[in-house]
């Protein structure tokens, strides 16, 4: 029987996210199980007789991959455009990239069938080396296997332990323990570990970039999973957050959450709230870079993060009963309540007001739309949405107008300069030629301009859509807090 190995000489373009597999390795047994499975797959492939059987084997393999085969935890990146242009890799079939990392140490090894046969191919290893740790770059397969077998078990969490918790799997009933650690970037151990860890923000936070680690104002919180393997404690990274310390007059610190990531295998399990609360608890009793923490803010939060933040903040406010004496009116003066929330919970004024919005929403559920108080509540929120969103578009229109005026002025100056040159020629030749520079025509003719009433109507429709989306999110938060039925 002749062995059949499917290959292609055609240069293809692959989605970098689909062909890249990130694998977290806890011990050498996982690598041995992986190797055994790969050898078995090769044997099966060698005995394939026709395309129908090949397709059958492919489907079987996909089903097996869904099951726990004793190999490393494996998952794909979400974004690769900061590593590979437009998330694309050029190469030949088959194209597969496996990035192995020690679950705790993050010692790495890149395994690829990729061979540099043509200058047209993407230099995968070269592109990864640009973004991986410079102090601890990927090592060879042989060195990686040896490291996992001999040294991975020696890894201990980075920083100072500040919290521990456990999560019980709803299906299996298995309880897993986790620990949260704090560290400052000025600690060289923290600095070096973070340099290996930060690749994950490129893979999972759109538009992210590496933080400037030469700046001493960075704090980092880590979550580690704890396992017992062969009677010994082992640790693996679960998630982390970077915090920047800003100065706040006179001798305080305003902490800002910059990056916040729970790795894909651990998402939707509740780790986000544990990490967030640990950040709050730490800064309540520990100074920041410039002194006591004034409040904790967020840098450009994504929608999902806002849901988490609203849940955590509102729950903490209600647990402390800080809304018990609040005036149930968004237009009322609740500054003293918001100030008490800031001092006790480090929640900023603006976020406290948003939590009050959600809290009041729960009070109005089931209330007729015609109710005066409920009507005032809805109008107040829509005014806020209008100011936040339409105000921005008005600013854009002003900028566009300024650019148009500047272009017109530049055109006038250019025409004057050319006319001066033409006047010299006119004097020589006895002519009277006038320079007339016309603006470049638009490639696409503009559509009919809308009048003010039509523009305002469009804006109000936009606000109504935003309000509907906001109500959905408030429902989610209140359901999570068991304040309304799901």
From Swiss-Prot:
The record's family statement is: Belongs to the HAT1 family.
Which residue spans adopt a coiled-coil conformation according to this UniProt entry?
27-69, 392-481
- Transferase as a keyword of this entry, yes or no, is yes
Instruction: Give start-end positions of Basic and acidic residues composition bias.
Output: 33-50
By its UniProt entry, which Gene3D superfamilies does this protein fall under?
3.40.630.30, Histone acetyl transferase 1 (HAT1), N-terminal domain
Q: What is the lineage of its organism?
A: Eukaryota, Amoebozoa, Evosea, Eumycetozoa, Dictyostelia
* Catalytic activities: L-lysyl-[protein] + acetyl-CoA = N(6)-acetyl-L-lysyl-[protein] + CoA + H(+)
Ranges for the region named Disordered are 33-78
Question: What one GO molecular function would you report for this record?
Answer: histone H4 acetyltransferase activity
Name the UniProt record assigns to this protein: Histone acetyltransferase type B catalytic subunit DDB_G0274269
Query: Domain named N-acetyltransferase: which ranges?
Result: 189-386
Which residues are the active-site ones?
299
Q: Which Pfam families match?
A: Acetyltransf_1, Hat1_N
């Amino acid at each position: 029987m002749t062995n059949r190995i499917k290959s292609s000489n055609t240069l293809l373009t692959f989605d970098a996210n689909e062909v890249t597999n990130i694998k977290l390795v806890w011990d050498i047994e996982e690598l041995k199980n992986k190797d055994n499975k790969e050898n078995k797959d090769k044997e099966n492939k060698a005995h394939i007789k026709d395309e129908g059987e090949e397709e059958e084997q492919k489907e079987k393999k996909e089903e097996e991959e869904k099951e726990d085969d004793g190999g490393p935890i494996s998952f794909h990146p979400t974004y690769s455009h900061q590593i590979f242009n437009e998330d694309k890799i050029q190469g030949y079939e088959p194209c597969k990239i496996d990035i192995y990392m020690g679950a705790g140490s993050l010692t790495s090894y890149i395994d690829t069938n990729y061979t540099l046969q043509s200058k047209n191919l993407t230099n995968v290893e070269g592109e990864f080396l640009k973004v991986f740790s410079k102090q601890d770059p990927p090592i060879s397969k042989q060195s990686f296997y040896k490291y996992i077998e001999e040294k991975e078990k020696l890894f201990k969490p980075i920083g100072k332990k500040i919290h521990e918790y456990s999560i019980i799997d709803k299906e299996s009933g298995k309880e897993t323990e986790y620990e949260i650690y704090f560290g400052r970037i000025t600690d060289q151990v923290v600095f070096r570990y973070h340099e290996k860890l930060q690749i994950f923000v490129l893979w999972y936070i759109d538009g992210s970039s590496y933080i400037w680690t030469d700046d001493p104002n960075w704090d980092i919180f880590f979550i580690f999973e704890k396992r017992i393997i062969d009677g010994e404690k082992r640790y693996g990274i679960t998630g982390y957050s970077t915090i920047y310390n800003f100065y706040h007059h006179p001798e305080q610190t305003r902490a800002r959450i910059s990056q916040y990531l729970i790795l894909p295998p651990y998402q939707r399990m509740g780790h986000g709230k544990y990490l967030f609360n640990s950040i709050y608890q730490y800064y309540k009793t520990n100074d920041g870079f410039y002194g006591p923490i004034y409040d904790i803010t967020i840098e450009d939060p994504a929608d999902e993060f806002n849901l988490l933040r609203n849940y955590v903040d509102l729950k903490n406010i209600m647990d402390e009963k800080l809304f018990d004496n609040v005036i149930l009116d968004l237009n009322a003066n609740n500054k003293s309540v918001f100030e008490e929330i800031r001092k006790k919970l480090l929640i900023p004024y603006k976020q406290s007001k948003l939590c009050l919005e959600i809290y009041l929403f729960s009070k109005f559920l089931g209330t007729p739309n015609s109710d005066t108080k409920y009507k005032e509540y809805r109008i107040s929120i829509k005014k806020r949405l209008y100011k936040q969103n339409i105000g921005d578009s008005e600013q854009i229109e002003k900028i566009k107008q300024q650019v148009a005026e500047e272009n017109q002025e530049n055109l006038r100056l250019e025409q004057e300069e050319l006319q001066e040159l033409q006047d010299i020629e006119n004097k020589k030749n006895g002519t009277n030629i006038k320079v007339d520079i016309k603006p470049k025509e638009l490639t696409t003719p503009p559509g009919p301009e809308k009048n003010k009433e039509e523009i305002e109507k469009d804006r109000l429709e936009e606000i109504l859509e935003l309000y509907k989306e906001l109500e959905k999110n408030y429902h989610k938060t209140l359901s999570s807090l068991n304040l309304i039925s799901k």
